[in-house]
Amino acid sequence: MYSKQWTRIILITSPFAIALSLLLSILYGAKHLSTDIVFTSLIHFDPGNTDHQIIWHSRIPRAAGALLIGAALAVSGALMQGITRNYLASPSIMGVSDGSAFIITLCMVLLPQSSSIEMMIYSFIGSALGAVLVFGLAAMMPNGFTPVQLAIIGTVTSMLLSSLSAAMSIYFQISQDLSFWYSARLHQMSPDFLKLAAPFFLIGIIMAISLSKKVTAVSLGDDISKSLGQKKKTIKIMAMLSVIILTGSAVALAGKIAFVGLVVPHITRFLVGSDYSRLIPCSCILGGIFLTLCDLASRFINYPFETPIEVVTSIIGVPFFLYLIKRKGGEQNG
């Protein structure tokens, strides 16, 4: 009953909360803007007005990008935690984000003239590579693995991929070009790239929501999922496909952003419970709002300079990660 009430509260208030977070993101930055200027630019855009140019070509794409990326990473984390029954699973910890960034680095060396859609496809391939490496290494452990052990494998794999990317960037002198994907500065959001990525975000989120009830069954354990007639392998493959689409799109659009997929699903689970038909939509909403507000905070930490968004999410995420390890030890979800 308590979780259903929170679900209603989140769903009912979400349009207002999203609108407020977007408005704040548009208003504040290196140059503060008034609400009058913002609404005037929305109603009657003046190409000769500098403030209108800032709003349409910088602030709106940045706010919309933060909302979409936060939603995508939160949903990805919720799916990974459900299908692995691992409370530490998230794209940044399980090597998915670093796999994407690694392949993008490789393609920048080998195929420097790649188009935006090609970079998106390479990012998907990299996300899949990262996931295969981590879960493949974990499957080789003779006595199985605990959530903490899987997180360690994921972290080591991520460090390896990140180190290889750094080595290539130094050797081939593309460090400046590569800094975008490893610093994740949302103020460099490309409006055209955002339009290209938006359908992929939509597809990934629709897939996740359509799988939500089946993921709930899988998260309850093998015996229960079998008794409910669920095809566990098919569900896991489809869920990971959704994760690859969402995470790959997020990394291609804005670079690596850590811990959103860890923190937001846990907060959402605390509020709405472990039913993924509620958890995934609510994680989507809260993830978008969370990253939009983190991006807003990144503008004031070292004002008037920008702080990389991953610094803000890590300040929140690292203590939360350590708290989960201390509180739950090696136990599995469910």
Swiss-Prot record:
GO molecular function: transmembrane transporter activity
UniProt xrefs under SUPFAM superfamilies: ABC transporter involved in vitamin B12 uptake, BtuC
Key words of the record: Cell membrane, Ion transport, Iron, Iron transport, Membrane, Transmembrane, Transmembrane helix, Transport
Topological category with respect to the lipid bilayer: Multi-pass membrane protein
Pfam family, one: FecCD
Major subcellular location class: membrane
UniProt record, GO biological process: monoatomic ion transport; siderophore-dependent iron import into cell
One GO CC term on file: plasma membrane
Compartment list: Cell membrane; Membrane raft
InterPro entries: ABC_BtuC-like, ABC_transptr_permease_BtuC
Record flagged with keyword Cell membrane: yes
Induction: Induced by Btr in iron-limited conditions.
Function statement: Involved in the uptake of iron. Probably responsible for the translocation of the substrate across the membrane.
Family: Belongs to the binding-protein-dependent transport system permease family. FecCD subfamily.
Subunit relationships: The complex is composed of one ATP-binding protein (YusV), two transmembrane proteins (FeuB and FeuC) and a solute-binding protein (FeuA).
Name the UniProt record assigns to this protein: Iron-uptake system permease protein FeuB
Organism expressing this protein natively: Bacillus subtilis (strain 168)
Gene, per the UniProt record: feuB
